[in-house]
Every structure is written in structure tokens, then in C-alpha cells.
């Protein structure tokens, strides 16, 4: 046992040979510790000269560099500080974060991933595509936008332009054509965004969209805030609608922005940095439903849009510009339906395609429409452009007018509301005089009101009394 211990110690004391340096491998003793079949060989690696050792970095070859290369960032700086800060939101100490998207973590919309949801971009030229812009409409809109970007001395310029008029007269589309003509990508809002289940959210959204437009202007590009159908979201449509806190906040926010257009802050975050002035364009059908101080002349410039005969003809030429309809036929079509809105002629053009759709349905069968339209390898069907003659257009126009007259003539809603769900069953009650026609009991004069003592502290208190007759008796 002692001999084995000394042998192991001899092995541990033997010098180790690496790369041919030091003692040779043949000096390793042959002991029983390594076994009888151990093959002993010496390493033959050449020695590396420490004086001539160099590390050379190869220059970057842009041909070999691809977008899929995960190490691309080592050669080029592809980071975005704003996006990196935003990604770190919620991952660092909240002490260094401003609340409500107002601190450094709130990235300025500068890349495609951060384009505002309300930003509308146009890819058309109204001159090339043949769209018609009414001269009066364009003059009003261009002048309002231009003077809001000018520094006019000692002049208070209304920030808001309210364009109102009848339904379907092309107010929104004419605005978009003017924006495209001027090279403006507006920040869009609709009436549906002016109400929310949370109090104050629509007012905050207006301020956010206004500041987004201000950021675009700060970068050197014209922008404006465009709100569609303001009266539908913030107006009062009689007793059938409820006036909520959000309605009040929307009106108050627009009034405040109109008074201080260069100092629009988000709730709870205030700084002294001024933002660029952003013109606001709103559309609606009846601005008398809005809060009166909002539409006063110092805050809102109002423009009533009623297209003339020339405007209607010009717009209709743009509607039928690809259908090879003669100009004389368009004039005849407009004169035949003088009381209709411009939207009527767009619906009239769409009605002409009914024959083509009906023909295609008869060919493929009603039971296979879903497979052909939604889950088809061939894709949706394509139709040849139908020939639009003046006789066909006048015929379909007459059908649309007849449908409008039926709605106004029948008025089933009034019939349902007056007769409730009982229909003719109310006739007997009406004849007997016991049917109040939906009026409350307090509104009918012949309903008796019980009198008596209504004071609970009195000894003769009558809980069924609805009017005090002065007969209360008190015990002292």
C-alpha cells in the first residue's frame, strides 16, 4: 500500500509537456497506474512566435451584409432612441417616468410604426383624377388654413372653421380634396370618438390629436385637425338624447383650445413650451345644437355649404368620369332631380351595377356565393363596366326617389310609437277616454290628487297624501 502511494506521488511530480516544450513525453515513467497498453507519443506542434503574432480585422463588405444578419447592428447604428425609450416603458423605475404619455418615454411620431391612428394620408391628385372642387368651398377653406399659419398684427383669427349644411352634400369629401390639393395630411376625428364610457376621455383625445398635429407642423409640414359631424357627437338633438359630462367636456375643451391655441396641455401635465397653432376644421348638419359660446364668431368661423347648380354638375362629372357619360346627359340628370343631394348621384351610379351582380349570382348559384367570394382560389369576380345611358340612369333615379317617398309617406315609426305594441287594441280605450296617449298622470288634469297632512312629525300624518291641506296636528 505504501509503494502504491509513492508511485502516485511520482506521477504528480512529473513535468507536463505541452506543444513540445519542457520535458519530453518519453520521460513520463511507465507505471502500473497508467496500465500496460498506454501509448506514449510526443506532441509535434510548432512553436508560435510571440513577437510576430497579429490580429487583423477584415473590412466590412456591404455585399455580404444583409437585412437578415443579426449582427448588422455592430457595423451600423440602427437604434432609435425614441423607440428604445418607449420599449423601456414599465421596465425602469417609475420615478423617471412622466405619467399620461407626456414624458420622454412618449415617442414623437416619426416612423411608420408610430404613425397616428388619426393621420389621413392621400395618394391622389384631384387635377389628374378629375375631381371637382367648388370654387367657393376651396376659397373658404384655403383662406382659413392660410391665415392661421400667418402672423397678422393685432388681429384675432378664429381657430375653428365650421362647415355645415344639408346631408349628403359632399362637405367631408370636398374638404379632403382641398387637403390633398394643399398637400396636407390632416389628423382625423369622428363623432363616435366624442363619447366614451369613461368621463373625460374624449376631451383628452382631442388634446392628444391636437398635439400630434402640432408635432407634424413642428417638423415642417402643414397639418390640421379635422373633426367630422361635430354636432352628432357634441350637440343636443332634442329630448331624445342625453347630455353627458363628456358633451360638456368636449365643448369646453374646444373653447379652451380656441382661446389658447399655442398652449394646449394634456390633463395633469403642464410645461411652458408653446406648441404650434393648428387650424381646426369641423363639419356638421346643424350647429344650432352646439353650445352657443363655442360657435361665437371669435372662436368659430361658420360657412354654410349649399352647392349651386354649377357645383352639382361639376361634382357629378367627377362621379361619372370613368363611365363615358356625355356632359349634356349629366346636365339633364342633375336638372331632372333638382332637390336631391350629391350623394344621391353616387348611389345612382352604384345601382347600375345591380344588373351585373344579379347576372353573376344566377350563373354561380345562390348556394355557392360564399365559396366564390370569401374562400375562392380565383379571387373575387371582376365585372365589365356596364354601359350607362341616360335612360337607364333616369330609370334607376326614379326608383330611388320612389323609395324615399315611401319612407316619408308610410312613417311606420310614428305608427308604432302612437299605438305601442298593442296595435288596434288601444282603440276601445281611446273611445272610452281612459287612454292617456303616453302622457304621465301628472300631466292629465282630471286625475285626483289626495290631500292631507304630509308632515311625518304630526300626530295625524297621512302617508297617502300627496298635497298638504294644512290640517296637521302637533302634540306639545
Curated annotation (Swiss-Prot):
Binding site for ATP: 165-172
A single Gene Ontology CC term: thylakoid
Compartments, as annotated in UniProt: Plastid, Chloroplast stroma
Entry keyword set: ATP-binding, Chloroplast, Nucleotide-binding, Plastid, Transit peptide
Major subcellular site: plastid
Interval spanned by the transit peptide: 1-56
InterPro entries on file: ATPase_AAA_core, P-loop_NTPase, RCA-like, RuBisCO_activase_AAA_helical
GO MF term list: ATP binding; ATP hydrolysis activity; ribulose-1,5-bisphosphate carboxylase/oxygenase activator activity
ATP-binding as UniProt keyword: yes
Stated family: Belongs to the RuBisCO activase family.
Role: Activation of RuBisCO (ribulose-1,5-bisphosphate carboxylase/oxygenase; EC 4.1.1.39) involves the ATP-dependent carboxylation of the epsilon-amino group of lysine leading to a carbamate structure.
PANTHER family cross-referenced by the UniProt entry: PTHR32429, RIBULOSE BISPHOSPHATE CARBOXYLASE_OXYGENASE ACTIVASE, CHLOROPLASTIC (PTHR32429:SF43)
Protein name: Ribulose bisphosphate carboxylase/oxygenase activase 1, chloroplastic
Species: Larrea tridentata (Creosote bush)
Native organism taxonomy: Eukaryota, Viridiplantae, Streptophyta, Embryophyta, Tracheophyta
Gene: RCA1
Amino acid at each position: 500500500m505504501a509503494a502504491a502511494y509513492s508511485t502516485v506521488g511520482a506521477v504528480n511530480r512529473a513535468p507536463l509537456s505541452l506543444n513540445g516544450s519542457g520535458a519530453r513525453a518519453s520521460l513520463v515513467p511507465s507505471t502500473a497506474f497508467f496500465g500496460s497498453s498506454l501509448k506514449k507519443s510526443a506532441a509535434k506542434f510548432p512553436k508560435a512566435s510571440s513577437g510576430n503574432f497579429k490580429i487583423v480585422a477584415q473590412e466590412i463588405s456591404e455585399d455580404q451584409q444583409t437585412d437578415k444578419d443579426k449582427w448588422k447592428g455592430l457595423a451600423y447604428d440602427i437604434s432609435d432612441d425614441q423607440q428604445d425609450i418607449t420599449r423601456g416603458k414599465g421596465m425602469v423605475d417609475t420615478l423617471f417616468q412622466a405619467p399620461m404619455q407626456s414624458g420622454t418615454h412618449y415617442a414623437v411620431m416619426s416612423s411608420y410604426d408610430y404613425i397616428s391612428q388619426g393621420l389621413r394620408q392621400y395618394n391622389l391628385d384631384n387635377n389628374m383624377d378629375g375631381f371637382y372642387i367648388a370654387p367657393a368651398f376651396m376659397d373658404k377653406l384655403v383662406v382659413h388654413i392660410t391665415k392661421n399659419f400667418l402672423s397678422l398684427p393685432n388681429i384675432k383669427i378664429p381657430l375653428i372653421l365650421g362647415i355645415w349644411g344639408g346631408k349628403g352634400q359632399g362637405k367631408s369629401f370636398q374638404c379632403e380634396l382641398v387637403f390633398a390639393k394643399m398637400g396636407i395630411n390632416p389628423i382625423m376625428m369622428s363623432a363616435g370618438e366624442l363619447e366614451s364610457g369613461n368621463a373625460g376621455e374624449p376631451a383628452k383625445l382631442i388634446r392628444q390629436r391636437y398635439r400630434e398635429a402640432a408635432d407634424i407642423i413642428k417638423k415642417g409640414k402643414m397639418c390640421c385637425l379635422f373633426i367630422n359631424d361635430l354636432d352628432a357627437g357634441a350637440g343636443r338633438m332634442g329630448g331624445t338624447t342625453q347630455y353627458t359630462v363628456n358633451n360638456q367636456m368636449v365643448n369646453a375643451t374646444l373653447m379652451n383650445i380656441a382661446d389658447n391655441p399655442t398652449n394646449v396641455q394634456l390633463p395633469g401635465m403642464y410645461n411652458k413650451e408653446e406648441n404650434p397653432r393648428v387650424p381646426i376644421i369641423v363639419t356638421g348638419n346643424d350647429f344650432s345644437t352646439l353650445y352657443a359660446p363655442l360657435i361665437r364668431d371669435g372662436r368659430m368661423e361658420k360657412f354654410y355649404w349649399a352647392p349651386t347648380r354649377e357645383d352639382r354638375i361639376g361634382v357629378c362629372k367627377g362621379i361619372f368620369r370613368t363611365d363615358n357619360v356625355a356632359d349634356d346627359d349629366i346636365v339633364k340628370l342633375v336638372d331632372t332631380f333638382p332637390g336631391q343631394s350629391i350623394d344621391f348621384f353616387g348611389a345612382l351610379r352604384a345601382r347600375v351595377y345591380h344588373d351585373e351582380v344579379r347576372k353573376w349570382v344566377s350563373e354561380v348559384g345562390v348556394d355557392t356565393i360564399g365559396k366564390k367570394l370569401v374562400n375562392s382560389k380565383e379571387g373575387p369576380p371582376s365585372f365589365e363596366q356596364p354601359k350607362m345611358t341616360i335612360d337607364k340612369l333616369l330609370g334607376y333615379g326614379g326608383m330611388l326617389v320612389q323609395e324615399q317617398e315611401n319612407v316619408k309617406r308610410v312613417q311606420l315609426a310614428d305608427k308604432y310609437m302612437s299605438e305601442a305594441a298593442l296595435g288596434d287594441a288601444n282603440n276601445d280605450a281611446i273611445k272610452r277616454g281612459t287612454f292617456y296617449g303616453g302622457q304621465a298622470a301628472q300631466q292629465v288634469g282630471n286625475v285626483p290628487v289626495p290631500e292631507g297632512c304630509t308632515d311625518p312629525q304630526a300626530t295625524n300624518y297621512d302617508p297617502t297624501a300627496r298635497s298638504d291641506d294644512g290640517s296637521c296636528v302637533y302634540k306639545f
